């Protein structure tokens, strides 16, 4: 009898973990800013982050088709540096570039992977716009908004529990350069690291898209995530919308896992942000 109940318990546990790690949630945020050109009212941005080689076998693509975004932004860690599988990432990329223009910045796993050059080549084949340390304008009906991207600071090959001063200086240096002569009033930043919101808010940035935190990996109802890289226990920025000063930030819980192999009360997530102006 004890063996029977043990088997039932283990089976139920595995079923629960499989559900928690594969049932993709769609989180929608409405973002309003009077600096946004009227032409961008209702502009829909789909945010993908932290795939870490995970395969969803078409289910993710079907959800994205139904969302029907105007653009797709990816904030890093498409691959996992410990078990890199570029093909898994490119299977998703090949599908989503047919849905909407796709913009990408690197995460720490790309920057620390010996396969990153190959990944960039593959992304380029599918016309994914690499936004690492780059600025561009998105045009809609003659109006424009700015899109800025920064490479993950692990480009300095320095991965520690907390970002080093050199890495923070790198981010500040790149943002100083990229925001120096902006031609757009409303500007979006793509950056893998949410813990640097206090840095981003010092620049002419209205909305940030970020990932990296994996939702805190295990979430406790009413308390939130338990642990995130570079933020430690009970991270402040593990999911959802945050605001400091005039800068708002959308943090994705991500889609895959890295060192820790499963999520609890923290399903994989697609984030949708719908823009609107005050008028």
Feature-to-residue mapping (PLM):
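Conserved catalytic scaffold of divalent metal-dependent phosphoesterases
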Residues: 35-36, 117-207, 238-241, 245-278
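N-terminal membrane-anchoring alpha-helices
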Residues: 1-40
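Membrane-embedded segments
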Residues: 41-137
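Short, flexible loop segments at the rims of nucleotide/cofactor-binding pockets, characterized by
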Residues: 48-54, 79-83, 162-167, 186-187, ...
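Structural motif
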Residues: 45-47, 71-73, 103, 147-149, ...
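Short, surface-exposed loop/helix-turn segments at secondary-structure junctions
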Residues: 221-235
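Short, charged, surface-exposed secondary-structure boundary motifs
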Residues: 82, 140-142, 158-159, 217-224
């Amino acid at each position: 009898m004890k063996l029977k109940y043990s088997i039932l318990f283990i089976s139920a546990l595995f079923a629960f973990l499989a559900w928690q790690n594969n049932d993709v949630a769609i989180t929608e945020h409405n973002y309003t800013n009077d600096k946004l050109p009227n032409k961008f009212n209702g502009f829909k941005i789909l945010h993908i982050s932290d795939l870490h080689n995970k395969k969803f076998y078409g289910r993710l693509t079907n959800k994205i088709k139904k969302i029907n975004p105007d653009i797709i932004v990816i904030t890093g860690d498409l691959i996992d540096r410990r078990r890199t599988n570029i093909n898994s990432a490119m299977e998703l990329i090949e599908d989503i570039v047919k849905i909407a223009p796709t913009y990408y910045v690197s995460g720490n796993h790309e920057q620390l992977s010996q396969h990153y050059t190959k990944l960039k080549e593959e992304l380029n084949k599918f016309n994914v716009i690499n936004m690492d340390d780059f600025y561009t304008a998105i045009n809609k009906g003659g109006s424009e908004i700015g899109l800025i991207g920064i490479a993950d600071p692990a480009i300095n090959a320095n991965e520690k529990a907390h970002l080093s001063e050199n890495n923070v200086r790198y981010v500040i240096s790149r943002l100083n350069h990229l925001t120096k002569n902006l031609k757009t009033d409303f500007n979006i930043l793509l950056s893998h690291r949410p813990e640097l919101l206090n840095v981003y808010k010092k620049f002419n940035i209205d909305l940030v898209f970020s990932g990296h935190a994996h939702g805190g990996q295990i979430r406790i109802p009413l308390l939130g995530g338990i642990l995130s890289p570079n933020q430690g226990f009970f991270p402040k920025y593990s999911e959802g919308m945050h605001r400091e000063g005039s800068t708002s930030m959308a943090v994705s819980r991500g889609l895959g896992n890295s060192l820790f192999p499963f999520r609890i009360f923290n399903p994989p997530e697609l984030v949708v942000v719908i823009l609107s102006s005050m008028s």
